[in-house]
Amino acid sequence: MGLYREIAKLVEYGLQTGLVVSADIRYTINQLLEIFKEDEYEEQEVSGEEIALPEVLDALTDIAFERGIIDSNDIVTRDLFDTKLMGVLTPPPSKIIEEFEDIYGENPQKATDAFYKFSQDNNYIRRDRIKKDIRWKVDSPYGKIDITINLSKPEKDPKAIAAAKNAPQSAYPKCQLCMENEGYAGRMNHPARQNHRIIPIQINGSRWGFQYSPYVYYNEHCIVFNGQHVPMKIDHNAFVKLFDFIKQFPHYFLGSNADLPIVGGSILSHDHFQGGRYRFAMADADMEKTVTIPGYEDVQVGILHWPLSVIRIRHQDEKRLIELADHILEKWRGYTDEDAYIFAETDGEPHNTITPIARKNGEVFELDLTLRNNITTEECPLGLYHPHSEYHHIKKENIGLIEVMGLAVLPSRLKGEMELLADCLVKKTPIEDHEELIKHKEWAEKIQAKYPDINDSNVMDILKEEIGQVFVGVLEDAGVYKCTEEGRAAFDRFIAVL
């Protein structure tokens, strides 16, 4: 029978990856049979077979739909169901925490290596979907910039969107970052998390959680979040928290989104940071100039050669960096320079904040302070220091922490649009024949003029290069001080008040 064989294969996968131990085989089989409302079972010979997890989960979810165990075959319902299956294979939090702490005692990097592998083995991070993401790099005056078209977040079909909209609203868990997600079954408007495990850590004297992002935008993309559902705030404590984590996991960087709309991330309601083990172009950016700040002569300070406006501070004692970061933040929050169109506030609404990123380089701690301002104007209603309308056909979303560091996370629609646009450019057919390409028309005409020899073999490379240059332009838009003589003079005026 197909069901028995697929259950046996799933359990064999658990054995091969260490999710299931031999003493738990029978128990695990019976737990899976219960989900399928199946009273019988016949032994299957699958020992040593190479198991492709996505295929097994697809087959089991198909059976569940055929049997009426799930009432819909859309992507959301299927994900809710196959996560339930993986929850059966996933050991309880206590076991994962114990294993992590044992390995951490030996070596923090080995502990995160093991936890990252586990988070993929149990399908919390869906390897098969992450592989679909399109990634490339482009050269820029600031170094090699990373571009991704994110295809790992599944597109919901209209039926699933309607079901999510009509689902009863619940305040549990309060958001997708809360501790209460661990083991939660999910619903049409909230993902299933039976296979989600959190490592508890102490940050600034309170209980925090450490987990990986299920969408891993870069290597070992982790999320470090407050045990309490409290809002994001960039202040003295935020800097303390960043370095508390870096001291525990010196092989990772950690950063925070800004705490104001437009320049912040998508979740401002829950205090959290994002980090990981990846070398972004920003980390390798050169110091454009070094400066000395009175009272902090022992701290190395410089302006970074980067499209956004970044002050980098370096010292072996992180406490000195926290003190200086406090000083810079306080001055920036209250800073106005009308000539540079920087206003600390208008009509009582604050505009200035910082996107901070901490890391350790050898024995030296480093903190990058990215100056942000969320003022809007009539010409730029979405934000003056935000992607301008000429770039919205590629990127109009907020420039958050990940983008600040030099990684574009672009919408999945671009994959299909680029394929269609490539066809039009090569065949020289009218772009306006395709409604979804009209927004790209001006840009496409510039590409045609720039590359008269565009053809089948070079068109995708050309489009990737030009998308990359659009993103560089987007980052330059987000910089409060432009990389021009005038912009740098204005930056110097701010440095002078420090």
Spell out what each predicted region is.
Residues 246-266, 275-327, 333-336:
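Catalytic or ion-translocation cores adjacent to nucleophile or general acid/base/metal-coordination motifs
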Residues 195-197, 229-254:
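Helical scaffold of the NTase/Pol beta-like nucleotidyltransferase catalytic core
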Residues 241-245, 327, 470:
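Amphipathic alpha-helical segments that form well-ordered structural scaffolds
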Residues 1-224, 228-231, 305-307, 321-325, ...:
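Active-site microenvironments that recognize anionic phosphate/pyrophosphate groups
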Residues 261-269, 347-353:
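Beta-rich nucleic-acid/ligand-interaction surfaces
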Residues 208-213, 238, 242-246, 292-299:
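Structured alpha-helical segments in the cores of large, soluble enzyme domains
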